[in-house]
Amino acid sequence: ERANASCLAQGLSFQPGVRVEDDCQNCGFTQVRINGLDGHYSQILVDSHPVFSSLTGVYGLEQIPANMIERVEVLRGGGSALYGSSAIGGTINVITKEPSRNSAQLAHTLTSLGGSNSYDNNTMLNASIVSESGRAGISVFGQSRHRSGYDHDGDGFTEVPVINSQSVGMRSFFRTGAYSRITAQYHHINEFRRGGDMLDRPPHEALIAEQIDHSIDGGSLSFDISSPDRRNRFNAYASFQNTARKSYYGSKQDPDAYGTTHDLTVAAGMQYIHE
């Protein structure tokens, strides 16, 4: 919110030691560099769970809406490799918003790209309800974003691709006792992006086109319990992310450049801590 970001990629740009790059003017592929290392050396977690697959990671930095994020934790250096094999450069842990009080918020931003008539149009909604006893609560979010294609040098080819995305999600908790709780989280993201030339025509009629249509579902369920003195803590969790992608990557009006990809990532585990 302080950075007026609409997605995770924009918010990470303000983190010290982290660099976000746009590496393709057609599809808008972004990667995050930690300590100068390429993006595939960084592990992205959602609520500390490694469900952010390699397929999702290609465009995922722009697909996670800012209004579902409570905070972002960045761990730099090889020590973060404890979180996964990809975490050589560092780890980015996205913590989703948890309900803390009854509230509702509606926001809309309109940003001009390079002072042109291309705009990034973003609408966000957040609401949360917490019971009077504080034993249960739920927060919901929604976002609708449209970004026009931006052609900086007027050659007919985009430097920034079109994005149309919609996302909804929730996070809830229920305290089963004084020192135990169940937490559930779910989100759904639809995103369409298109870059190249002749954006108003089918991609196989353009000179060059990259078009990607994503449908992403993800969620998690966790149980936490601790002793009264917090010296003994136990956590069990299960999480998933399912991604379906339809794409076109081609040039010279190639009719055979369409493709589909499906990816399912499931993670589960338990942790016991004694101090």
What are the residue ranges of the model-derived segments?
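Short acidic/polar hinge/loop motifs at secondary-structure boundaries
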Residues: 33, 49-76, 97
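Flexible loop and strand-edge segments within Gram-negative outer membrane beta-barrel domains
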Residues: 147-167, 173-175, 179-234, 240-264
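Outer-membrane beta-barrel channels and translocator barrels
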Residues: 5, 99, 131-134, 175-179, ...
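Transmembrane beta-barrel architecture of outer-membrane proteins
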Residues: 3, 29, 59, 87-89, ...
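Residues on the lipid-exposed face of transmembrane beta-strands in outer-membrane beta-barrel proteins
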Residues: 125-131, 170-174, 221-225, 268-274
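Transmembrane beta-barrel strands of outer-membrane/channel proteins
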Residues: 106-112, 140-146, 184-188, 236-242, ...
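Extracytoplasmic beta-strand/coil segments of soluble accessory domains associated
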Residues: 9-53, 70-71
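Outer-membrane beta-barrel translocator/receptor signature
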Residues: 53-55, 68-70, 81-153, 161-168, ...
